[in-house]
């Protein structure tokens, strides 16, 4: 007879059990988010009603627009943060300046750092935020739903014919992504092959000639649909390939909404035929 503890739990019961095991002695009551991505993570993890301030451009969900701004590209307003008396700060390790964060940490304020480089780490961040949330079950459920969605996309597009993909950011100068970013992983999820995946730096500056040498079959940009015509014109007449424009906020933020960009990209990538000469 199988021991009781070895019976597999239904998924909902497993999530509830994890929530009970990670329930903090005291959840955070006054939370400050220092990037749009961590603001979205906070809401997804059930911390939205505990936010007292956020960064500039924290515009999702709608209620985030009503919150005070204490950080921007110009820096972090340490004095104002201290006046708000937070018991938790959510920071973006790759984007927020470290010195003011060190000052805040030295004063005893807990800081949660988020800087996913792999798409699965977004779910991990949600699970970790559960310990601070008054609704830990919401954080764990959001993480589980995220993982399920990722697996669904992986299964659906695993057999797609690979397409050499150029991730384009800007034109003058021209930047792209290496294989060590969330954006590159989204491309891989949809059957694309990042032509600069082998770059040693995360966001290399490249030349027009370097791009053409690697012969991309599709170009991916973030922005509105109007970007498509501009990017297509930029490469004429030497390079004529499909251009896919993804919602900028979905694609560039390390939050659950990046899967909306993934779904958008996968659908459009799948509709692009592989050139006959390269399909064998």
Swiss-Prot record:
Keywords: Disulfide bond, Periplasm, Signal, Transport
NCBIfam families: PRK03379.1, TroA_like
Name the record gives this protein: Vitamin B12-binding protein
Domain Fe/B12 periplasmic-binding per the UniProt entry, residue ranges: 30-277
Organism of origin: Yersinia pestis
Reported function: Part of the ABC transporter complex BtuCDF involved in vitamin B12 import. Binds vitamin B12 and delivers it to the periplasmic surface of BtuC.
Site (Important for BtuC binding): 79, 209
Residues the entry annotates as binding cyanocob(III)alamin: 57
Gene3D superfamilies: Nitrogenase molybdenum iron protein domain
Compartment list: Periplasm
Family stated for the protein in its record: Belongs to the BtuF family.
Gene Ontology terms, MF aspect: cobalamin binding
Signal sequence interval, chain numbering: 1-27
Database matches in InterPro entries: ABC_transptr_periplasmic_BD, ABC_transptr_vit_B12-bd, Vit_B12_bind_prot, Vitamin_B12-ABC_binding
SUPFAM superfamilies: Helical backbone' metal receptor (SSF53807)
Oligomeric and partner information: The complex is composed of two ATP-binding proteins (BtuD), two transmembrane proteins (BtuC) and a solute-binding protein (BtuF).
Cysteines joined through disulfide linkages: 190-266
């Amino acid at each position: 007879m199988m021991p009781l503890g070895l019976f597999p739990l239904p998924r909902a019961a497993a999530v509830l059990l994890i929530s009970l095991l990670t329930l903090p002695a005291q959840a955070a009551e006054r939370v400050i988010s220092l990037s749009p991505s961590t603001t979205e993570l906070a809401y997804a993890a059930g911390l939205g009603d505990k936010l007292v301030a956020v960064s500039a451009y924290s515009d999702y969900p709608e209620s985030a627009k009503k919150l005070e701004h204490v950080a921007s590209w110009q820096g972090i307003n340490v004095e104002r943060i201290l006046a708000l008396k937070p018991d938790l700060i959510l920071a973006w390790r790759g984007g927020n300046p470290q010195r003011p964060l060190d000052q805040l940490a030295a004063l005893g304020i807990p800081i949660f750092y988020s800087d996913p480089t792999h798409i699965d780490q977004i779910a991990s961040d949600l699970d970790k935020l559960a310990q601070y949330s008054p609704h830990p079950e919401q954080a764990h459920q959001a993480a589980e739903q995220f993982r399920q969605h990722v697996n669904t996309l992986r299964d659906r597009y695993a057999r797609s014919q690979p397409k050499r993909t150029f991730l384009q950011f800007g034109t003058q100068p021209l930047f792209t992504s290496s294989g060590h970013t969330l954006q590159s992983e989204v491309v891989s999820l949809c059957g694309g092959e990042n032509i600069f995946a082998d770059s040693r730096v995360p966001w290399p500056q490249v030349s027009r000639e370097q791009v053409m040498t690697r012969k991309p079959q599709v170009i991916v940009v973030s922005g509105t649909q109007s970007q498509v015509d501009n990017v297509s014109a930029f490469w004429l007449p030497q390079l004529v390939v499909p251009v896919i424009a993804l919602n900028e906020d979905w694609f560039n933020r390390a939050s659950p909404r990046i899967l909306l960009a993934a779904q958008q990209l996968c659908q459009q990538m799948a509709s692009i035929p592989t050139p006959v000469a390269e399909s064998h």
